């Protein structure tokens, strides 16, 4: 089982190709809805004062590649992964951490472990 790329699959296949919901509804289900369910304040939305966690993509090409096995776990163990398609950047707390070519070299990653939820 591999859920790598689930959000990309939702955006590319279920929203763009199958049109089961609007792009706005799909993004809300991937961002705002989980933040609300788990009681994580100021996440999953774009508004003044909220954390600037952003994902830049092309709705015409967003998706994921076919799953493939890589052997990069300790002891040479395998895992399944997919590559993003149509993704141009990821920002965490307002700091860009990924571009269309992959993870960026930065001195300090801006994310934090969420240890407390309000749910």
Language model features with spans:
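Active-site microenvironment of metallo-dependent hydrolases
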Residues: 1-119
